[in-house]
Design a protein with these regions (language model features):
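Extended alpha-helical targeting/anchoring segments
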Residues: 1-236
Length: 236
């Protein structure tokens, strides 16, 4: 599938960074951990008892994308993706659109507001030569702890209900949806295949198959796929 060339800004598909130092913050334990010889970069954390100024100028946004035009264009992309699937070129394709907007927020302030509006297990903020990357995701790409490889496929979702009873109803509806379940099983199979390329023979297993995790605004079907890493395989 060719790379799209009419993007409104350039950002490479991959950025490899050899960071001098990085910071990890556990929101559950409220613990900062600094790694690297240049941990002095994070000395400001010693002042983390100072209140954050929430009286700053209210955020403003101006959308530069023609949403109507993008919606019409997206329909054509869907049809093209179906052709790729029918021809056997792809098993799975993720379609996306680029939304560009101007704002008076710096990236760190945007990250802070994002963490309040959409708290997720995996949030990140890091600068690159092409721009700052900020994100909020419920899903890991891959976790390697010791010799264990872990992937947690997420596919299938419903919004959170207005109360506990509606949450239960939506969860049951989600788990009985043939399309959502088929998509999730496909991702579990892909995760098993991916881990199997680097794991010891016979060590790949699936646990907690198709359980539902609830987040602030949405619920997802999640499974856990594990394997024991071969001795000749590194995290890279």
């Amino acid at each position: 599938i060719p790379q799209k060339t009419d993007a409104q800004y350039f950002f490479p598909p991959f950025v490899f960074a050899n960071a001098k130092a990085y910071l990890h913050y556990s929101k559950i334990n409220k613990v900062y951990s600094c790694y690297g010889e240049e941990g002095v970069y994070f000395d400001f954390l010693q002042k983390d008892d100072e209140a954050i100024d929430d009286s700053a100028q209210a955020p403003t946004y101006h959308i530069h994308t023609d949403l109507q035009q993008e919606s019409e264009h997206f329909g054509a992309i869907v049809e093209k993706a179906k052709e790729y699937i029918r021809s056997g070129d792809v098993f799975q394709v993720v379609l996306s659109e680029q939304l560009c907007l101007a704002t008076n927020l710096d990236s760190l302030t945007f990250y802070r507001l994002l963490s309040q509006a959409n708290p997720s297990p995996y949030m990140f903020h890091f600068p690159t030569p092409y721009g700052d990357v900020v994100g909020s995701s419920p899903e890991i790409l891959v976790d390697i702890t010791g010799n264990q490889i872990h992937i947690a496929p997420i596919a299938g979702s419903r919004p959170r209900g207005k109360d506990a009873n509606e949450d239960v109803r939506l969860e049951q509806e989600l788990l009985s949806d043939p399309k959502e379940c088929a998509e999730h099983r496909m991702l579990v199979d892909l995760a098993r295949n991916d881990i199997g390329k680097f794991a010891e023979k016979g060590s790949v297993s699936v646990k907690n198959m198709m359980h539902v995790l609830r987040y602030q605004h949405i619920m997802h079907i999640v499974s856990d796929v594990y394997g024991n890493k071969r001795a000749d395989v590194s995290p890279f």
